[in-house]
Amino acid sequence: MIIFSGGTGTPKLLDGLRHIVPEDELTVVVNTAEDVWVSGNLITPDIDTILYLLSGRIDRDKWWGVKDDTFQTHREMKELGHDESMMIGDLDRVTHIMRSDLLRQGLSLSESIHELLSVYGIGVNVLPMSDDSVRTIVETPSGHVHFQDFWVKQHGVPEVLSVEQEGIEEASICSLVLEALESDDEVLIGPSNPITSIGPIISLPGMSRILRKKKVVAVSPIIGNEAVSGPAGKFMTARGFDVSSRGIADCYREFLDVLVLDDRDTTSPEQFQKMGVDVVSTNTLMKSLEISKDLSKKIVSIFANI
């Protein structure tokens, strides 16, 4: 099974899925359009969240970063007048330094991730969507900013006028992702932001054409008219999509077979049938590992019946 993932929502699902599906049968394709260089090192937030989850190091209170991390280096730099744009933990920074050193040695992003998977003893295949640079740029009333500036510096407060992925047309799907897609027919789109997390992955040239030939199941990150977490609603509105599970189906309608809704969602199934999308309702609000496991079992069953 191939899982398309961002840094929120999908990691919680993956936490349960790896207990249901053997790790060596899972490939996680991760968004890299939110990556940014900070203090001389490449930060890959979504990839790092997956790495920390699978290595048992994630801070489960925040669902990002390393548990029990400290921030002495960040504080010391601030005291010395270096305005580091992101608050980076000391243990988290180790990963960034190791990856950036590998990149400076000439390794690709996917090759650097392979090295980190080995170091952390991770059996799941984790891949970047592309080895090329793609940047999510958010337009607000005060101008265009990188996604991290919008989300970290501006706390996601400004109105979003538009969202674009800079460099997406020139980027190529990672060759290892293409290999995985050639050998696996099941693609699970996790409950991550459809515009800034999943959007870059499916917007890579040629990806939609490939997905039309696959069994594609998506888990909605929207319950009712609200995102479970993060700024998905703002970005969907900026792109002209309804902030609803129907809007999620609309984002993926070109290739989507089944959309998994939360059982609290009251959207009429007929609205999806008109789009050629089947729906399955279950508990998608993963407040515990057991709920994540139950959802994962349901997803495995859905794929078996497509």
Curated annotation (Swiss-Prot):
UniProt KW Plastid keyword: no
UniProt superkingdom: Archaea
Binding positions for 7,8-didemethyl-8-hydroxy-5-deazariboflavin per the UniProt entry: D48
Cofactor: Mg(2+)
GO biological process: F420-0 metabolic process
Keywords: Magnesium, Transferase
Pfam families: CofD
Protein EC: 2.7.8.28
GO molecular-function term, one example from the UniProt record: magnesium ion binding
Pathway as given in its UniProt record: Cofactor biosynthesis; coenzyme F420 biosynthesis
InterPro entries: CofD, CofD-like_dom_sf, FbiA/CofD
Catalytic activity: (2S)-lactyl-2-diphospho-5'-guanosine + 7,8-didemethyl-8-hydroxy-5-deazariboflavin = oxidized coenzyme F420-0 + GMP + H(+)
Role noted for this protein: Catalyzes the transfer of the 2-phospholactate moiety from (2S)-lactyl-2-diphospho-5'-guanosine to 7,8-didemethyl-8-hydroxy-5-deazariboflavin (FO) with the formation of oxidized coenzyme F420-0 and GMP.
NCBIfam families, A to Z: F420_cofD
Quaternary structure, from the entry: Homodimer.
The family this protein is said to belong to: Belongs to the CofD family.
The protein, known as: 2-phospho-L-lactate transferase
Species annotation: Methanococcoides burtonii (strain DSM 6242 / NBRC 107633 / OCM 468 / ACE-M)
